[in-house]
């Protein structure tokens, strides 16, 4: 009770953290991010610290549930991988915040096998890569990849209408744009040689731009942390010879392997990839 004095007796090396407020917390915790690893694992992150360990996944059996040390994140492993493009609904059962408020709202994510939205290793002409119903539709991190050979300027490489875009700028550099934020490379890519251009939107809202495996630029917009990319057709521009979009934010090492014959190594989601800062 606020204003009341309490005495706490601690054992040697014991630590207790107390939260005190002059207002009662009656707000239920909510799932603010739900992701898949493209295989059998779901990652569910709440908007505050919670207790409990029971979930229901609609039309699926759960193999295991593990809570992370941050007390906000759960890793749910399913007995079998969902069908490609199936909607996976997660329903909290006994999840409560530190004030005892119970989580009641479910959350859903569209499952894509191996996190692939679209993947085309041999683009022969400019045009549509994926129709709107098969496009990215999420507030999670994602990765856009293109192999390009061009001498042009101010040309689109990969875009999902006005939702995001990889392009060649008027100066011949690479750029990656999402919701008002643009990362630009220092390196020119319109030299008639082949270049691998990758844009990554991380879960904290940071945009990163890689050219030929090297980080070339970044940009940040706090509103992009939970900015939702809406459905629209995905298209490739002139000079693009390979293209892909993934519903996961790949890290530096994974980006370096994009487009290689041996393909991407299996990526394991970690807390570092989903624990984000407000600033």
Please provide the spans of the model-predicted regions.
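Surface-exposed, short loops/turns at beta-strand junctions within beta-sandwich domains
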Residues: 79-87
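C-terminal beta-strand-rich structural cap/linker in extracellular carbohydrate-active enzymes
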Residues: 2-25
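Short, surface-exposed alpha-helix to beta-strand junction/turn motifs within ectodomains of secreted
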Residues: 37-67, 90-96, 107-110
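Acidic, Ser/Thr/Gly/Pro-rich low-complexity segments and short DxT(G/T)-type signature motifs
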Residues: 23-33, 91-121
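Short, aromatic/His-centered strand-loop micro-motif at the edge of beta-sheets
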Residues: 175-196
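Flexible glycan-contacting loops in extracellular carbohydrate-active proteins
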Residues: 215-241, 267
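Extracellular glycan-recognition modules
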Residues: 117-121, 125-175, 201, 206, ...
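Short tryptophan-centered beta-strand motifs in secreted/extracellular beta-sheet-rich domains
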Residues: 193-202, 209
